Amino acid sequence: GSLAIAQLHHAGMRSPAQLIGHQPLCPSSDEETDSRAFTNSEVRQLRDDFVQAALLAKQAGYDGVEVHGAHGYVVCQFLSELYNRRDDEYGGSLENRQRLLVEIVDGINESCGNGFLLGVRLSPERFGIKLAEAIDTCEVMIDSGKVHFLDISLWDSFKLPAEEEHQGKSLLCHFAEIDRKDVKLTVAGKITNAKEVAEVLHSNIDFVTIGRSAILHHDFANRVMADESFEPIATPVTPGHLAEEGLSQTFIQYMGNWKGFVSTAETS
């Protein structure tokens, strides 16, 4: 069977004010998003809220949690030199910018125990995250001995890094070469068919993270294991197809925001 892992997420400055009912919060004030900076006590409360959320997930019967530290959300914002301009213990040096994530991981491990699966999602390059700093954060997580897996969202698993000094090998290779000890590594980013799954797994990656293709086919993993040449259905697909794959009407409506994913009308 499968494991149930809850992803813990706070959008920070990416939170829509009309949805949350107040001004978004960010490591440092941000004029573009009209976000104000967390106070020091609010940062500690944020940390405690992540820990409490993990504990609630455990009590609800989940096998583990993943802390979302990627895609420009709040943990990523703290890691980013671009968005984190704080002058307290949570800003400045990379070690200080990593502090919130380290404290969240420490708190979850202490509250939920080492038998409760704990993963961290990270992403390089965008939102001010430099590749070398992303790798350093991975190594900090590994050396802590408190995480079971790292989930690296690469945007495109097969592309070369954006930073010229790292372009001798793909983004995938940079992360696959990390000495991760007993920590498992998964990657995401334009892994869409059986051939690409195999290529990633043969690159010293423990498992793959699938988004779009798993939305198109709820049984994508089984199809890939049964057919090494499996290709998902071409997009756009009808709302009816997505309903048959188990998507709710709200989910289907949301997927309509993805350009070229859902057709505007059912075919006869």
Label each region the model flagged.
Residues 1-268:
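Flavin-dependent oxidoreductase catalytic cores
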